[in-house]
Amino acid sequence: MTQYTPMIQQYLKVKADYQDAFLFFRLGDFYEMFFEDAVKAAHELEITLTSRDGGSSERIPMCGVPYHAAKNYIEQLVEKGYKVAVCEQVEDPKTAKGVVRREVVQLITPGTMMEGRTIDEKENNFLAALTHFEDGSYALACNDLTTGQNTVTLLTGSVEDILLEVYATGSKEIVVDSSFSKDELNKLTETLKMTISYEDATAIPEGLEHLVKNVSQAKLIKAVGRLFNYVIRTQKRSLDHLQPVEIYYTNQFMKIDVHSKRNLELTETLRTKEKTGSLLWLLDKTKTAMGGRMLKQWMERPLIQKERIEERLEMVETFVNDYFLREDLKEKLKEVYDLERLAGKVAFGNVNARDLLQLRRSLLQVPAILEAISLLDNAYAARLIQGADPCESLTELLGRSIQENPPLSIKDGDIIKDGYNDKLDQYRYVSKNGKTWIAELEKRERDITGIKSLKIGYNRIFGYYIEVTKANLGALPEGRYERKQTLANAERFITDELKEKETLILEAEEKIVQLEYDLFTALREEVKVFIPKLQHLAKVISELDVLQSFATVSEEEQFVKPVLTTKREIFIKDGRHPVVEKVLNGKLYVPNDCIMPENMDVFLITGPNMSGKSTYMRQLALVTVMSQIGCFVPATEAVLPVFDQIFTRIGAADDLISGQSTFMVEMLEAKNAIANASERSLILFDEIGRGTSTYDGMALAQAIIEHIHDQIGAKTLFSTHYHELTVLEDSLDQLKNVHVSAIEENGKVVFLHKIQDGAADKSYGIHVAQLAELPDSLITRAKEVLAQLEGQEEIIIPKRVEVKAQAQEVIPEPVVVKEEPVEIEETKAETEEESQLSFFGGEQSSKKQDKPVLDAKETAVLTQIKKIDLLDMTPLEAMNELYRLQKKLKKG
């Protein structure tokens, strides 16, 4: 390294500690990058790659960005999952001896970003830390640096289960120890697309012990310690806004695994991965950013304590019934900014004057909000606002200190109000009156000299000056002015009087800017004292915001308050899928009941594709989730139990972790439900067994249904195309057949989207293909093949005619295949030969046989065959019927 210049040596020394990050190295007005950083950054940021002499024989790759535009470039890199170490000059270059001293002042990572376009105002930006213990358990700690929120939980289960819980936090970055399994790290980076960081220190850092007072378990403390040590090491600044660690256990909330959350589209849609079209999109009528974040957290973790759910429902009911209270609250909430993130900026030291004005405007709304809620006759409301401090002294302080329209930068002055500081007022008086004096001097000099174009100006190099054009130089009184600068068409002069005033004015202006900066930083420290109170207020206001949001959407969409029962019964009258109904935007939506008394556990749902089976199943799950987060539900009446878990297998399998096949994922999800569901769970299985052969699939589906029915007793909706399974209603007393109705009109299927008792009488597969606009020729051929499979009495099958190039088109002549009288074949081989030929559309055997005389049993079978409506049966149903008739004949 000795061959490099001192500056490059300094760069390499700093870079050695930040090998996994881009090093933004401050050089004057630029942040420069060198060596591999420069090559990679130039590519990622699409900026010019240059080179410079660094003392070695070869030039060093280099690229840079202006310091005033660095924020945008840093955000671009962090968005892509990179880390950026910001290295600043920490001494004045004018007074430095040798190379200017530089230090990394912050490491910016995906999990520690404080602001920017990557930070959604209504979403948390969690940094996760995962700690593995010898007994196979894990502790997961999370921190949102923008709000100061900290959580920790203990996890058990497979590695995939643990990683899915990590995925559920939405974290973009995870901190682990340096010995963490490489295989597990690969799953985090390749599948979950998370940035990996390392931290081996696990002791709680000095000064943060108060944040873990309520945490006694050593494993949890170790995970939190790893998280806090990483945050301190990377941020290198005050963390006064960090909140006490909240412990949560997964069994305290309704458990919904990641696959189920995605299938149900709770917070984002399956197709676009966006909020629009999800349940969160529908329910989010929050007026504050922090309310939006709390709503999402509630949706991620629905409650299972009946009393807590009912408390929320009662508050929502209060807001629904009191329009004026709700509207007044909404108007005030509109004026409340993000108190949590403002508190974080105060602690971090990057809050500006405009931020503090937002804080003041927010606090002005608080007294009226708290007073309105205090008047409610509601124990939950009283408990919610208990201890909430409106911080009126802070409001008053900000009101008399900050100008109404301050600049964005805190170093440009014009931030502090007149009257806040005596010394500042004095400097401003000198500056203001000095400029007035300058204007008066200009007028006086014009009168004395008679030169109307004479003017007094200012620039940073020469200060104040009197400027006279060369044409008027002869009119100047002798000895009155001292020449200062000669221009092409003018001369500039000064006087002793002007010099004196210049000194006073410039000193005052410099002191104003510096004093305002000092006063603002002191004010910022005063605001820090209020951070805990502001965070408590933020939680109160967030909760009120979510509750009014529930009330608003419940009234707008005509939702009803659910009644929670300790019984295992579901009674939903005219239930609707809330999102589908909203998307239909006024078009007719068909509501459906879901009535499952205590002695009814399984609905076996049949019906054609596109008829609404999956929508009906999702509808029940969404109604359940809405109920247990404390929202009204889309129905005219709803009585619901409190479910402990929801398991789903709906839609296309999407394996997040292990890369398994669709059928394997389907079976793993079925296993998850069977292994973990209780009689208090809700299971939704859509077309289980479709990923394998017909008989395997049907056998598995039946076995799963029987196990759920006999061993678990969970409320279950099980949709299937295996119509043969509907006979289970005869042997399973807590299973009921229901179907989605459809009718045929003019050869076309019309879906009624109505759930009715009993099994479906037809699958309408080819009709659905018609709706999908498959080619007419394909549809016609499908009907022909179906007719062959079902043994139709008379089938018209077009001959396949090969048409050679440029040959005349030949229209195939239809061949009529007539059904021979039913006869019992003497040998199995002959029977199979006939069957195979018929299946592939070949000609019947030419072997002539005498027409036998049928006995009474055979005649009865023939009569039954003629009465069968084959177009109303699935291929499997037709085959089963054929076996039954064959057995009947053989018995004879």
Swiss-Prot record:
Q: Does the keyword Protease apply?
A: no
GO biological process assignments: mismatch repair
Matching InterPro entries, A to Z?
A: DNA_mismatch_repair_MutS (IPR005748), DNA_mismatch_repair_MutS-lik_N (IPR007695), DNA_mismatch_repair_MutS/MSH (IPR017261), DNA_mismatch_repair_MutS_C (IPR000432), DNA_mismatch_repair_MutS_clamp (IPR007861), DNA_mismatch_repair_MutS_core (IPR007696), DNA_mismatch_repair_MutS_N (IPR016151), DNA_mismatch_repair_MutS_sf (IPR036187)
Q: Extract the Pfam families matched here.
A: MutS_I, MutS_II, MutS_III, MutS_IV, MutS_V
Indicate, by first and last residue, each region the UniProt record lists as having compositional bias (Basic and acidic residues): 845-854
GO CC term, one of those recorded: cytosol
Q: Which GO terms describe its molecular function?
A: ATP binding; ATP-dependent DNA damage sensor activity; damaged DNA binding; mismatched DNA binding
Keyword set, alphabetical order = ATP-binding, DNA damage, DNA repair, DNA-binding, Nucleotide-binding
Per the entry, what this protein does is: This protein is involved in the repair of mismatches in DNA. It is possible that it carries out the mismatch recognition step. This protein has a weak ATPase activity.
Into which family does the record put it? Belongs to the DNA mismatch repair MutS family.
The name this protein goes by in its record: DNA mismatch repair protein MutS
Source species: Bacillus cereus (strain AH187)
Q: Which gene encodes it?
A: mutS
